[in-house]
Amino acid sequence: MTLLTACGGGESNVESGNRDGFLHYGNGAEPQGLDPHVVTGVPENHIVRALFEGLAVKNPITLEPEPGVAERWDISDDGTVYTFYINPEAKWSNGEPMTASDYVWSWNRALHPDTGSLYAYMLYPIVNSEAYSKREITDFDQVGVKALDDLTLQVTLNAPTPYFLQLMDHYSSFAVHPETLLKHGKMTDRFTPWTRVGNIVSNGAFTLDEWSLNRRIIIKKSEHYWDRDAVALNGVYFYPTENVVSEERMFRAEQLHYTQVVPLDKIPEYRKQGNTSYVQAAYLGTYYYLVNTDKAPVDDVLVRRALSYALDRDTLTRTVLQETAIPAYSITPPDTLGYNPPKLFDYDPAKARELLAEAGYPNGEGWPGLEIIYNTQEAHRKIAVAVQQMWKKELNIDVSISNQEWKVYLNSVSQRDFQVARRGWIGDYVDANNFLDLFLTDGGNNNTGYANDEFDDIILNLAPKAKSRDERYSLFYKAETMMTVSYTHLRAHVTAMYLV
């Protein structure tokens, strides 16, 4: 990251931050919360990962797992038993030592059906975790998580899981402080005051110092973090700014060191600048539209196919997105750790019109209407307008678009109160499984209504037991093919752009 230095009269945030060791960060929306077992969004992720740390952490360059709370680990010869040895210096922010029992309690909470964690399925590689999460068993002692002593945690898996250590760096696997949660409610309660300033006890490099709603969140370096001397920053200011233009203006005024959003019409200007602060880089993520398969008219696969064939992704990425993205024809990004997903369709407006007519809407006649929802941001609006215009031009159908504030949007998606909804998925770990398991039947992040027993069996049982990477990827390809032809989501692009 490049830190900017201020110029002109008065001291900017960048100038004071450079002097005092505080990063000023544009964080998009106001976070829904800071509970690792409840939140799901990118704005929440940035803060939660600063406040908490997992058993392992990813090296930012190699992406390989490195020691976090666990100073080391052993893996059995058959790859199914992980033994984590907790660092004796790992402490909670109140100074209490971390223990293996903290993880047993926390994973009980994350998997408990009453908690309603949308990421519970992340822990399904663990023996009996899925059965516990689905109330098929009620005794957590039957789940493959055991505290052998205060500093030794043993985890038993259903099958060798290549990405399991990467999961230890995802907030769904983070430990929470049991006594703090129970002081403010039951183990499974959601959005209680335990995450507020003065209440929260965390274990990461930073602690929560201030949370001024819709203004800023301040975190400061923790006095009790085990690797405190390696933390370069004294703190971070997170600013919730859903207005992209305002956030970019803050960046230019040197009120921010870093922003991940850039007004699309400003990108050519930044590209022309010498020594520019604009960075465009590969991102393991896919931008797509969710389709609620229980809502007419998109409950008809013919309609969903027509909408997909009528979407000109090349034009969208070239003109609207200023070539900051590549067209996406699958949920999994191309070449994800060597896995290349199927491409089963392309832009074909004639085929789209044929499919729509077959569905009973020739040339758009009798079309009942359709709404796209998206969370408030200018780029999302421009994409929605472009898609709206493409569908009108090619299919002669009317589509309305509606923006929603971040928390309202998250609720609409989780309650499946939409026909078509903007969505993006950033890889939590580097593996195609992280994109495909989004569509498991009744999965916490499956908001489409897609349900396929064969798909579930491949993702949950067959792929984990594959004898080779080629066999595993072949199974992924089969699963992604059957899921793609259901057209439960309309892939748009893969992208990354930000200012530093």
Q: Where is each model-derived feature located?
A:
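Aromatic- and charge-enriched surface segment that lines or borders ligand/interaction sites
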Residues: 71-122, 154, 297
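Extracytoplasmic/peripheral linker and loop segments enriched in polar/acidic and small residues
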Residues: 318, 397-409, 414, 434-491, ...
